[in-house]
């Protein structure tokens, strides 16, 4: 080795191993708080081990992965990192529960140009809080410090979740039929979808979202409100009634694109848009961006985070169980029969908005 050339280290290349190890130490307690009895061992192994919970006759594993889209850009711009982890968990676990699955464990991937231990620990603490709300274990993850791939301390997130459902109790929409009722659960705001449009509206309007107030709250807080996690109330509904025929997590694509994913070929969802008061944040976005009404429902959830299909005769019981679980449900529409070329989702009373 030439004595004239300085000795290079990984740190010189932009990767701080000590920072990575410091992060792991800080988040071990977060993972421990989420632990389920089926999880074997703590953080730090090469792989995470988890038993199938007792009591299942024919357990089927259900998996999902997701991110939080460009809501992350807004979080970075606002330097607000405490709830984006809950968004990440919600996007994954809500997709599992619509199959009837109980989430078991969750892993995250955090990639950054330069690791800021405080920011990363804040994000992972939010992931842990989301896992607690969903009843699943945070069993591991990957923190990748990749200089030259991301600008400064910018970071990207992905989440991965595995759940379990009894084979005979999988909810797949196959029993949906004309006359069934559709029940909605409210969202907390835009959740984690439509943020490229939202950011464009903010840019075009020139609004200072920290200063704009809607219903007495800063617009920035309304836009960063964490995605709701519906797992526990929905699992209670399934267990107590056995009445759930289908569920749709209202994400990117809104009501128009997500409900058809769980409908049989001849079924059409007829939605009464006048059945709920759209939160003010959506009205502000529509007004500032001059967004077409149908486009609003195709991009944003417009105040609806989850739609549940039950027989009309089970609707009142379902509403009762959901209210007892702390939800504020309402009947948003019904199922009708339709032809092959018909619209799969019909939005009535659009003019009322």
From Swiss-Prot:
Any one Gene Ontology cellular component term annotated for this protein: cytosol
Reactions accelerated catalytically: 2-formamido-N(1)-(5-O-phospho-beta-D-ribosyl)acetamidine + ATP = 5-amino-1-(5-phospho-beta-D-ribosyl)imidazole + ADP + phosphate + H(+)
GO MF annotation terms: ATP binding; phosphoribosylamine-glycine ligase activity; phosphoribosylformylglycinamidine cyclo-ligase activity
CDD domains, per database record: PurM
Pfam families in UniProt: AIRS, AIRS_C
Subcellular location field: Cytoplasm
Tagged with keyword Transmembrane: no
A biological-process GO annotation: 'de novo' IMP biosynthetic process
Catalytic EC class: ligase
Taxonomic superkingdom: Bacteria
Enzyme Commission identifier(s): 6.3.3.1
Gene3D superfamilies in UniProt: PurM-like C-terminal domain, PurM-like, N-terminal domain
PANTHER family: TRIFUNCTIONAL PURINE BIOSYNTHETIC PROTEIN ADENOSINE-3, TRIFUNCTIONAL PURINE BIOSYNTHETIC PROTEIN ADENOSINE-3-RELATED
NCBIfam families with a match to the protein in the record: purM (TIGR00878)
Homology family: Belongs to the AIR synthase family.
Name used for this protein in its record: Phosphoribosylformylglycinamidine cyclo-ligase
Gene from which the chain derives: purM
